[in-house]
Amino acid sequence: MAKGQSLQDPYLNALRRERIPVSIYLVNGIKLQGQIESFDQFVILLKNTVSQMVYKHAISTVVPARSVSHNNGGAAHTQQSPAVEAVADKAE
């Protein structure tokens, strides 16, 4: 497994497994929304009203709708989306 995918795969798998809604921003600025149905080395299948095959080289950013816990090499990590952090900051 390539070093670059050692974080990518567990993260995408957690999003898929927990059915967390995501916004995927493409390098051309287009925003796609849905749930990750499946992924491999080159593509992500994104499901909303239809399934879309999105090539990873076209993706700029993946933003989950809520925080996600993923396991990378035995260490658990929790990542919060910026939108969730902004709401939490305002509540304090």
UniProtKB/Swiss-Prot annotation:
The keyword RNA-binding applies. Pfam families: Hfq (PF17209). InterPro entries: Hfq, LSM_dom_sf, Sm. Residues 69-82 have a biased composition (Polar residues). It comes from the Bacteria. Coiled coil: none annotated. One of its GO terms (cellular component) is cytosol. One of its GO terms (biological process) is regulation of DNA-templated transcription. Keywords: RNA-binding, Stress response. GO terms for molecular function: RNA binding. The keyword Repressor does not apply. Belongs to the Hfq family. RNA chaperone that binds small regulatory RNA (sRNAs) and mRNAs to facilitate mRNA translational regulation in response to envelope stress, environmental stress and changes in metabolite concentrations. Also binds with high specificity to tRNAs. Homohexamer. This is RNA-binding protein Hfq. It comes from Actinobacillus pleuropneumoniae serotype 3 (strain JL03). The lineage of its organism: Bacteria, Pseudomonadati, Pseudomonadota, Gammaproteobacteria, Pasteurellales. The gene is hfq.
